[in-house]
């Protein structure tokens, strides 16, 4: 490991700790983890391991977007923590077997995007027209919510919390009222039919939405 790489990683971490006014962070995630497959990869990973060893972070890992990234990274680097997108229509990490694999290997799994940037909880009259190509999916989703007498927010939250392979659910809120609604939601397990699972990246990957 080069001293230059470690010094850079250490400075990034200590600057964050200073801003947050804390002595350590729970998790340090690479948001472009495919950098680990480049020439600097081993040095970078060793630097992450060192900041963990000296007590600046508890766990190190990746924030990833597709199972294919794990296919590449897993044989090379074993993370403590992985964050992935997961929701009622994006079940790629479950269907590929990666959630179960990480659980069996004691890797902590955090999921994000359970509301898919808010799209899954929008009233049907507020859904942007560019999502009309999936009108059949929305019709079935709205009908199912009505039949279950449940809100979309409750369904999305309970679906994610029901998965035994998931340790934490990461949620963003716009205001205190949204936070109160989420905290007051039932945490009872909920099975959402597999028919809602969707493979089209133009829908399930928000980075594609600007092209619609």
Where on the chain are the PLM-derived regions?
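Short, acidic/polar
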Residues: 4-20, 65-72, 156
